[in-house]
Swiss-Prot record:
PANTHER family per UniProt: CYTOCHROME P450 (PTHR24305), CYTOCHROME P450 12A4, MITOCHONDRIAL-RELATED (PTHR24305:SF166)
Family the UniProt entry places it in: Belongs to the cytochrome P450 family.
Residues listed as glycosylation sites in the UniProt record: N332, N434
Name of the encoding gene: CYP169
Listed name of the protein: Cytochrome P450 monooxygenase 169
C-alpha cells in the first residue's frame, strides 16, 4: 500500500470518527431532551438495539399490538442506540402526520439505503422535488390509463396459468408449487411491459434472463439485505461512503446497466413522441400507453411551465422505482390472498363461483370492478395481510400532534396532544391499524370478506387513500400506483382461482411472516430456502 493510500485511509478514518462522535453527542442530547421520554412504553431491552431485536423476532406487528393492550394507544419504545420512537394508533394523530408530509418525512437512514439502489425517484425524494415528480406522474396512474393496461395484466395472468399447468404436467396433480416464485415472475413481466414497454420474459419456460432482468435482480437482492452493519454505518457516517465494498460495487455495476438501458428507452420514447407531435401519426396501441411514455409525454407538454419539468435524470430515476414499487408488493399481496383462500375453502369456492359467472376469460377493468365478492376478497386481503406492514417518519421540526384519545404520561399527567422535537422518529403502524379490534371489532384478525357488506363506523376515521385502511397510506405521499396494483391483483386472482384449486402444502403453523420492508411468507422448518409459499395446486374442472 502506498503512502498516499495510507494517508487517504487515515484521513477517512479521522473524518469518520469525528462524524461518529458528533452524531453520538447529538443523539444523546436528543434522547435526553426529547418530549417522547415522558410517554409510557415497554422497558428498554438492550442499549444498542433497544426493543428492535424483540420486534424483529416476533411476527409482524404482534409485539406492537401487545404494547397497545398494555400501555394504551400512544406509547414510546426504543430504537437504535436506545433512541425514543413514537408509536400511536390514534387515527387523528396519524391523519395529522400523514397529511403534513413536509413536517414528517422518511428518515435519512432509509432514504440513503433506498436511494443508493433506486436513485432519486418518487419513493425517495421529499418536499418540492416530490411534489414536482408526482405532479407529472399523476396522470399516468389515473383510471383511464389503468383501464388501457388491464389487457397486459390479464394476458400475463393467463401466462402464469400456463406456467403452473406445465409444472403440474411434470409432477402430477396436485403439484406442490411455490406460488410466490411464479407471482414474482408475473408481476415483473407486467411492470416491464406496462411500465416501459420492456419484455422481461420471466414466465418464458425456455427463456434466459436478459441484461436488465439480471441488473434488477442484483439491485433487488441488495434492497433485501440493506440492514447489515457496514451499509448501516455508511448511512449514519457519510465519510465511510467513500470506502468501497462488495455490495456497493454490485449495486454500482447494476445501476450502470440500468442507467444505460433506461436512457436508451427514454431517448427512444422522446424521439417517437416528438415525431408524432411534428405530424407523424402515432400508432394507438399499448406500446404508446406504458407508464414511462405517459410520463415523458406529460413532461414534454407545451403548456407545462419550464419550472415544473423533470430532468432526464429525474425521469430515469422512475425506472427502478416502477420496478420495485410495482413488482414486489403486488406479488406478495396476491400470495397472501391465495394463502387466505386455502384457510377458508368456502370463501375460495364462493369466489370461484362468482368469477365463473361472467362469460369471458379476458375481463376488462370495469368487468373486474363489477365483481363484488372479488372486491371484498381483495379488500380483506389488503387489510389482514398488508404487504407493507409499517413505515417510519421523522419530525423535521418541533411540533404538537393532536389526539382523539388523551394518554397519561409517566408523571401521571393527562395529555391531549403529543409534543415532538425535530429528529424524533415516528412508527406508522399500517398493519396494527388495519386489524385493530377497537376499530374493526373482536374478529379483526379473522379473514372475513363478508365484513365489507357493512363496515363499522369507527373505520371511517382511518387516514387511508383506499377502502378505510392504511395499506396504501394516505395524504400527499399515499401510493400513487394503488389503482394499478389493485387491478393487476384482481386480474391475477380472476385467472388463477378460475383455473385452479389451492390447498396449503404445509401445516398452517409452519407459515410465518418475515419482518422486512415487504411482508413475505416463509416456511418455519425450511428457513434456509428463503421466502416461499408452497401450495398444492390442481386444475379446477367445472361440473
Amino acid at each position: 500500500m502506498t503512502v498516499t493510500a495510507v494517508n487517504v485511509l487515515l484521513s477517512l478514518g479521522v473524518a469518520a470518527l469525528a462524524v461518529a462522535v458528533w452524531k453520538a453527542v447529538v443523539m444523546v442530547i436528543q434522547i435526553a431532551t426529547s418530549p417522547l421520554r415522558n410517554i409510557p412504553g415497554p422497558p428498554n431491552s438492550n442499549w444498542v438495539y433497544g426493543n428492535l431485536k424483540e420486534i424483529f423476532a416476533a411476527e409482524n406487528s404482534v409485539l406492537h399490538e401487545g404494547w397497545v393492550a398494555k400501555y394504551g394507544n400512544t406509547i414510546k419504545y426504543k430504537g437504535w442506540l436506545s433512541r425514543n420512537r413514537l408509536f400511536t394508533v390514534d387515527t387523528r394523530a396519524l391523519n395529522y402526520i400523514l397529511s403534513h408530509s413536509n413536517e414528517y418525512q422518511k428518515p435519512a437512514l432509509a432514504r440513503y439505503n433506498l436511494g443508493e439502489v433506486l436513485g432519486e425517484g418518487l419513493l425517495i425524494v421529499e418536499g418540492e422535488q416530490h411534489r414536482q415528480q408526482r405532479r407529472i406522474m399523476n396522470p399516468a396512474f389515473g383510471p383511464a390509463q389503468i383501464r388501457e393496461l388491464t389487457e397486459i395484466f390479464v394476458e400475463k395472468a393467463q401466462k402464469l396459468c400456463l406456467f403452473w399447468r406445465n409444472e403440474i404436467s411434470k409432477s402430477g396433480e396436485p403439484a406442490r408449487i411455490d406460488v410466490l416464485n411464479g407471482l414474482s415472475k408475473m408481476t415483473l413481466d407486467v411492470i416491464g411491459l406496462a411500465g416501459f414497454n420492456y419484455e422481461f420474459d420471466s414466465l418464458n419456460i425456455d427463456g434466459k434472463p436478459n441484461e436488465l432482468n439480471q441488473a434488477f435482480s442484483v439491485m433487488f437482492r441488495s434492497l433485501e439485505g440493506f440492514a447489515i452493519v457496514f451499509p448501516l454505518l455508511k448511512a449514519l457516517i457519510p465519510p465511510l461512503r467513500l470506502i468501497p465494498d462488495g455490495r456497493s460495487r454490485r449495486i454500482a455495476k447494476a445501476r450502470k446497466v440500468m442507467r444505460r438501458m433506461g436512457m436508451e428507452l427514454i431517448t427512444k420514447k422522446k424521439a417517437e413522441i416528438l415525431r408524432a407531435a411534428a405530424g407523424e401519426k402515432e400508432k394507438d396501441n399499448l406500446q404508446s400507453r406504458d407508464l414511462l411514455t405517459l410520463l415523458i409525454k406529460a413532461n414534454l407538454a407545451t403548456d407545462l411551465p419550464e419550472s415544473h419539468r423533470l430532468s432526464d435524470e429525474d425521469v430515469l430515476a422512475q425506472v427502478p422505482t416502477f420496478l420495485v414499487a410495482g413488482h414486489e408488493t403486488t406479488s406478495n399481496a396476491t400470495a397472501w390472498c391465495l394463502y387466505a383462500l386455502t384457510q377458508a375453502p368456502e370463501v375460495q369456492q364462493k369466489l370461484r363461483d362468482e368469477l365463473w359467472s361472467i362469460p369471458t376469460e379476458n375481463p376488462s377493468m370495469d368487468e373486474l370492478n363489477e365483481l363484488p365478492y372479488l372486491e371484498a376478497v381483495v379488500r380483506e386481503t389488503m387489510r389482514v395481510h398488508a404487504p407493507v406492514p409499517s413505515t417510519i417518519r421523522v419530525a423535521m421540526t418541533d411540533d404538537v400532534i393532536p389526539l382523539d384519545t388523551p394518554f397519561v404520561d409517566v408523571h401521571g399527567q393527562v395529555q391531549d396532544s403529543i409534543r415532538v422535537k425535530k429528529g424524533d422518529p415516528i412508527f406508522i403502524p399500517i398493519l396494527v391499524i388495519n386489524r385493530s379490534k377497537a376499530l374493526w371489532g373482536e374478529d379483526a384478525f379473522e379473514f372475513k370478506p363478508e365484513r365489507w357488506e357493512s363496515v363499522p363506523d369507527a373505520v371511517q376515521h382511518i387516514p387511508g387513500v383506499w377502502a378505510n385502511q392504511m395499506s396504501f397510506l394516505g395524504g400527499p405521499r399515499a401510493c400513487i400506483g394503488y389503482r394499478f396494483s389493485l387491478i393487476e391483483m384482481k386480474a391475477l386472482i380472476f385467472a388463477l382461482v378460475r383455473a385452479f384449486e389451492f390447498e396449503l402444502a404445509v401445516p398452517p403453523e409452519e407459515i410465518i411472516k418475515k419482518s422486512t420492508a415487504v411482508q413475505r411468507p416463509l416456511v418455519r422448518s425450511e428457513m434456509v430456502k428463503g421466502c416461499q409459499l408452497p401450495l398444492l395446486i390442481k386444475p379446477y374442472h367445472t361440473v
